[in-house]
């Protein structure tokens, strides 16, 4: 896979912002088939920084109920499952996209 296929998007939330500022951890939404080595290589290629370590989490899909305007359930569905990557960098390294 190419680097742009592995890294889907950065995750920008309050929790990820505090982690980025305090312990220099960046969080990305990644391809479900990517592994740690591929994620590390993609970060190195795209942002020109060398990650110290990388942790991956599989986020399971959740059941959802589609509700009509009157409040009646009219169908059931699921959200998509996805994968999250925590990328640890050295203190002096930064990623400029954030």
UniProtKB/Swiss-Prot annotation:
Keywords: Ribonucleoprotein, Ribosomal protein, RNA-binding, rRNA-binding. GO terms for molecular function: rRNA binding; structural constituent of ribosome. Coiled coil: none annotated. One of its GO terms (cellular component) is ribonucleoprotein complex. GO terms for biological process: translation. It comes from the Bacteria. The keyword Plastid does not apply. One of the early assembly proteins it binds 23S rRNA. One of the proteins that surrounds the polypeptide exit tunnel on the outside of the ribosome. Forms the main docking site for trigger factor binding to the ribosome. Part of the 50S ribosomal subunit. Contacts protein L29, and trigger factor when it is bound to the ribosome. NCBIfam families: PRK05738.2-4 (NF004363). Belongs to the universal ribosomal protein uL23 family. This is Large ribosomal subunit protein uL23. It comes from Borreliella burgdorferi (strain ATCC 35210 / DSM 4680 / CIP 102532 / B31). The gene is rplW.
């Amino acid at each position: 896979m190419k680097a742009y296929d592995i890294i889907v998007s950065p995750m920008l939330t309050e929790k990820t912002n505090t982690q980025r500022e305090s312990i220099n951890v960046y969080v990305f939404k990644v391809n479900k088939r990517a592994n740690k080595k591929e994620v590390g290589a993609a970060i190195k290629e795209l942002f020109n920084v060398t990650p110290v370590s990388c942790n991956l989490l599989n986020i399971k899909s959740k059941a959802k109920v589609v509700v009509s305007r009157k409040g009646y359930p009219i169908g059931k569905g699921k959200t998509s499952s996805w994968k999250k990557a925590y990328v640890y960098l050295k203190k002096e390294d930064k990623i400029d996209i954030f």
